[in-house]
Amino acid sequence: MKLYNVKCESGARAVILDDMILTKDMPTTAGSKMLGGYMSLFDAEAVVRLASAGYSVAGKAAVGEFGIDLLGESSVDGALVKDGKIVNAAAEIVLCGEALAAVTLDVNGSTRRAAAQAGLVSVKPTYGTVSRFGTVPAACSGECVSVSAKSAADCLAVLSAISGHDDKDGTSLSESECKSALEGGEIKKVAIVEELDELCDGDVKAKIDAAASSLSAAGVSVEKISLPLITSARAAWNILMTAELCNNVSRYDGVKYGYRAENFLGLDELYTKSRTEAFGKLLKTAIIYGSETLSTENYMKVYDKALRVRRVIVEMLNKVFSEYGALLMPAVSKMAYAADGVALDECFVENVFTAPASISGMPSVVCGGVSLLGAAFSEGKLLALAEKI
């Protein structure tokens, strides 16, 4: 996988970006041949705010094609493999100390999976508290600009720098709401979701048990609860994500920008050949699925139903968070993915752990190999809780 280096030197306040975030002095490819060598005319709002806060961009790390895969294995540059396991480029750079933090676009949970397996802290904020202006659109109703670092304190510092209202983002929340999300506080009651705990292997269960023990020792009450509906978030999110992705990548037709096929007869053949040659297998699979979802025949019985499930999931979680401060859940099913053992569509199964946060827009913090899901605007509290794990 490529790492695009820039002029600034890495240092104590150096941040790595993933390749879904636009930068005017570096290529932005979204891990796809379709955007090979694409240069943006402007920086993303998150990049502008990082610079204003005194952070430097140490470079850009490649991502899986449009950020929908497990850890980046679908990138046009190929998977990044370490000791026979697939690893995430941005997470590895932070882990090696070459950057203080990684600022990434979390589309389908890859940022959180990477942090869990690398032993980093990662925060996916409440939807709308960080501007998405200047990010490559994939699944707009759930994707969030996220932060990963070695400590909760570093995550909070970088998140504070990029959070805030932005008039250029129509989904951006008010300044007061953005600030309230960063406020600390004590969470005294946490629940473990039995249905998700049963879907992971022994190593992940050991991480959950260790986190529960640490929280209990710190005076936090930990209980097990049953939430049968929570696994429905995966199916609903896959429907919404692929439908939105299908719509967003329709702009790449070989005419205005992006890859263009050389030999074609007519406009239709230009579209077909350009997309066939430039899109990868996983993205094509998602496009086909999304197209079928948005068809006249399936729109009401599939897409509309997924929107209804989203509302039910949000209502269920709000009810849970009226009693508990956070849910303690796995972030992955296993602590490593073998380079030769990952199915093409495994990302649509593995996201059962990350989909609840994606579809609900609620914040999630990964630490110690586990995930903490909280109510909207509770990321400050979740990061404080993470320090106890």
Go through each PLM region and give its residues.
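A short helix-breaking turn/cap at a secondary-structure junction
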Residues: L3-S10, K124-A206
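Short glycine/serine-rich loop segments
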Residues: D43-A44, A51-I162, S360-G368
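Short, well-ordered beta-strand elements within core beta-sheets of diverse protein domains
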Residues: M34-Y38, E143-K150, S291-S295, L372
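Glycine-rich, small-residue loops and helix-cap segments
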Residues: D43, S52, I162, V222, ...
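Gly/Ser-rich, acidic/histidine-flanked active-site/gating loops
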Residues: G170-C246, R251
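Short acidic, glycine/serine/threonine-rich loops at helix termini
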Residues: P27-T28, I68-G72, R112-A118, G134-T135, ...
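Generic secondary-structure signature for well-ordered alpha-helical cores
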Residues: Y55, P125-G128, K150-D154, S160-K168, ...
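Short, well-ordered alpha-helical
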Residues: M1-A44, R49-A51, A62-D69, T171-E183, ...
